[in-house]
Amino acid sequence: MPSFDIVSEVDEQEVRNAVENATRELSTRFDFRGVDASFEWKTDQTTMRAEGDFQLGQMLDILRNKLVKRGVDPESIDTSTPVHSGKSWSQVVTFKNGIEASVAKKVVKAIKDSKIKVQVAIQGEEVRVTGKKRDDLQEVMALVRNGELGQPFQFKNFRD
């Protein structure tokens, strides 16, 4: 029986490149001259530091633009609320890897509500879809792509 897995992954190398490009753009932008602003990359998250809340918003826009240019979906980021300490502001941007249980349940419910004849199973941080016909699986792919589930999805292990 044909099957495939629905996963949500972010290419860490592309994200790191986007953060480095954003750091480079910060050093060349006129509105950030003489301002203490920086991006700090850690595994699966980036910390933005600036002197003002408005500048954090601009930095987030720069980061989103660089992510899009590197082929990373901007829906794959979660931003925390800006934190003010002393004269600097900081904000943590986390990158979503894997499908959380609540999102996986929404995916399963959306597929089952569509009445497409497939079996759906949650397996850790991925969702396995199995069906009798390849066309049914392609319908499920289209359904998941068009669904507004707050997270980008990729399809792997397509077996015929």
From Swiss-Prot:
Domain of life: Bacteria
UniProt keyword list: Nucleotide-binding
Single GO MF descriptor: nucleotide binding
Gene Ontology cellular-component terms listed: cytosol
UniProt keyword Nucleotide-binding, yes or no: yes
InterPro entries assigned: DUF520, UPF0234-like_C, UPF0234_N, YajQ-like_sf
Keyword check for Ribonucleoprotein: no
Alphabetized CDD domains for the sequence: YajQ_like (cd11740)
PANTHER family: UPF0234 PROTEIN YAJQ
Protein family (similarity comment): Belongs to the YajQ family.
Role according to the record: Nucleotide-binding protein.
HAMAP family hit by this protein: YajQ
Protein name as annotated: Nucleotide-binding protein Sde_0533
Species assigned in the record: Saccharophagus degradans (strain 2-40 / ATCC 43961 / DSM 17024)
